[in-house]
Amino acid sequence: QPMVVIGAILGAVMFYFQGCEMWNVGSVGLSSLFGTTLLNCFLIPSTMSMDIRGWGEMFPLNGPCWSLFFEYIAYVLYAFIFRKVSTRVLWWIVPLFAVGLTYAAFQGDYCNLGWGWALTKENFIGGMFRLLFSFTAGLLISRTYHPGIIKHPFVIGSIVLVVLTFMPNVGGHKYNWMNGIYDVFCITCAFPFVMCVGASATAISDKTKRIATWLGDLS
């Protein structure tokens, strides 16, 4: 994807010219920087030993690419497996993946679902559960949900998202288990609700429709 390549190149430039005490570019050879940039361009994850920033990231020059990496895995799984899975089977496996997601939320010291950004066992398992639940739940909703008439769906969805993002962490370090419950609730209940509400939005202006279509095509 062009945006992946552009992001990797920009990341390499910014890393090289904005070095600091934490990210000492002087300790990174040009060959290592070039190799990491090339891996990022082709969306090939870096191992812990190959990370040039010291955080152990899959994609140290364009961190958010880890999410796109798991999306590519989803595309492969859909092409070979999930598109053939019946709706009845989805009703069984979605709750199972939700259990796995809950398990992932309570691993580590912080009780959250911020897994998937590093090529470690814990991060890969956590990232896969995030992927498997969200993707299969989306398939199930697309097959079974029939949009109805909901008044002000945009307002409702926006308010829910604003409220959720105002609470990025719940319970603090002492009661971090509360944050695990909150993260699981958001992914398994709140976000699917927002998606269903948004799918019920039909009465939109031509201008809004063109903007939404353009954003969808851009994505």
Identify the role of each PLM range.
Residues 1-4, 219:
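Structural motif
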Residues 3-70, 100-115, 121, 185-199:
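Membrane-interface helix-loop-helix regions
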Residues 5, 9, 13, 76-80, ...:
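Generic alpha-helical transmembrane segments of integral inner-membrane proteins
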Residues 7, 89-109, 157-165:
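Small-polar-interrupted transmembrane alpha-helices in polytopic inner-membrane proteins
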Residues 48-55, 81-85, 114-219:
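Alpha-helical transmembrane segments in multi-pass integral membrane proteins
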Residues 57-82, 131-133:
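Function-critical hydrophobic alpha-helical transmembrane segments in multi-pass membrane proteins
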